[in-house]
Amino acid sequence: MLATMIATATLAQGVVDVHSHIITPEFISALDKEGRLMDEGFPLPKYAVAEHLKWMDEAGVQTSVLTLAAPQPSSAEVVRQTNEAAARIKREHPGRFLFCAALPLPDVSKAIEEAKYALDTLKADGIKLATNVRNSESHQARLNGRVATDEDEVNVGGQYLGAPELDTLFSFLNERRAVIILHPHRPEPVNRQVMQQTPLAMQEYLSETTRAVSNMISRNVLARYSHIKVIVPHCGAYLPLAIPRMKSLTPVMQANKMVGEIDWEANLRALYYDLAGAHSPEVIRMMLTITTPDHLLYGSDYPYVASQVLTQGLVRMKKYLSDETDLAPFREMILYQNARRLFDASQPTKGSDTSR
């Protein structure tokens, strides 16, 4: 009995990882057919549930939240297959996995349909959204055997979060009190020289995330849809620098009719931040200039980072969260409490009213 109680207590305090990715054979095959395996500037890592669980056990991670990796496939069928695969993993390993479902954007009607299916039938714990999604013309160019030209990419562009066309989707997600996990994707168009020396993940991913969140704030999206909670990846990207600058420029933008009223408090209150990437005490302190400790979450970015590196990074985080006197009070909050509270709050209660 005592052993069971100790084991249960240990599991209850296990780390929650809100940033991990599922990579299925169907996903890889679809990208290969579209000629997009190297879209992000680096090859996709291999993924196996057994290896994921092995790392989680070694590192002391109790629960991982799965999301579809970048880039976004153009096939709604592949998106559905990935969501069903993630749901199956969650079902087969209760307590070890949650998942946030991908959507087949930019088709908003299909996206809402998939969100309903994922949340109601697959019991998804939230929704994953790309910072931008492209239309199908550049995909079709590749499928037809030619590389998309600069003209294709300029004409296609990328539809960023915050675009008015997505209001219907955000209204639905607001009704469902959804947790949304953001992830940066390749910007459209992208100068080919950008990736000559470094992959997109090094710099453009941070720019993409900052751009998408700034776009949502500028349209007051998270104030208008106040039941939505958004997890921003990679230590908040450039937002600790961008938000003060955006605030200072808002009067000028308003004077030039570029933006309307922005409820800064409401928008920022909706944002949570994972610590995947180059976390450190200094980074966390910088993030606390734009948020509060109850909005910080542990994230690994598994399997894009080697297991050994992730384990060492988590050990280092636990140590500085214990040793740094100003951060020590937030240790359990960051490692597991905030994530559990966030995802528990996203689950609908019977008869709940989300219309207000």
Feature names for model-found ranges:
Residues 11-18, 22-63, 116-117, 125, ...:
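Mid-to-C-terminal alpha-helical segments outside catalytic/metal-binding sites
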Residues 21, 132-134, 185-186, 236, ...:
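Catalytic metal-binding/acid-base residues of hydrolase active sites
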Residues 24-47, 146-152, 188-209, 246-270, ...:
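Active-site gating loops and adjacent loop-to-helix segments of metal-dependent hydrolytic enzymes
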Residues 2-12:
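Hydrophobic alpha-helical targeting segments used for export or membrane insertion
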Residues 217-220, 226-266:
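Aromatic-lined glycan-binding groove of carbohydrate-active enzymes
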Residues 122-126, 175-179, 198-201, 225-227, ...:
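Glycine-enriched alpha-helix->loop->beta-strand junction motifs that scaffold or abut catalytic
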Residues 16-20, 64-66, 98-101, 127-129, ...:
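Hydrophobic faces of well-ordered beta-strands that scaffold small-molecule active sites
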Residues 62-63, 67-212:
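Active-site gating/metal-coordination segments in enzymes
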